[in-house]
Amino acid sequence: MPRLLTYNVHRCVGVDRRLDIDRIVGVIAEHEPDIVCLQELDVGRARTGFIDQACAIAEGLSMSFHFHPAMQVEAELYGDAILTSRPERLIRSASLPTVRGIPGLEPRGALWSVIDIDGVQVNILNTHLGLVPREQRLQAQALAGPDWLGHPDCAGPTILTGDFNATSMTRPYQLLANCLPDAQRTLGLKPSIKTFPSSFPAIRIDHCFVSSDIIVRSMSAPFSPLARMASDHLPLIMDFDVNPEATRRLVA
């Protein structure tokens, strides 16, 4: 059964303020996912030793990857990535809109890859939304629009995941949930699985939204001592099947 893991890795700095990429790799590897969606990766940044974290984690997991730099300061990059052990190709990697005139807002972006799941082309979209409700709404609208979820090529089996910085009570969440159902709600999970903060998870801001062709089998958030220490978020894991009647198209 395919397994997706989404994880805000906090630039591989744990709650003990220690930079440790191997610890992040260990948390992920323990659960043997087929698809990994990561947020808050540093690539070539002085603050984390100029390491390409996306490449290092992918190598540690023996996966291919695509990275999108939501923010670039000269040669230093910060952003998100999709990793997988399955055949894949990148469809789109781009910035999301922001609000001008508000100091301190970080640029945000998203990636869209197509991954082959037993001969079926599955759209995987990974994102990390902003902190301010107004920019979150703009970003959610963009994701729901013609460049992303509304694109004709995104009509098949689709998973949108990441750190949305938005709970289920917010307008950005509700806008996206109107496009694709929340995976946790398709399972009727009560209480819901929360991932932030990792030491005492009380908030649900990491989500998986799925199309009707994605059959969610189970969801979990590892709460091991290692997972609680490695990042300020816990990973969110989703086991799923793809509707066998979905169009079977091999990745080119």
Language-model-detected regions and their locations in the chain:
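Generic internal hydrophobic packing segments that stabilize the cores of diverse globular domains
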Residues: 51-54, 80
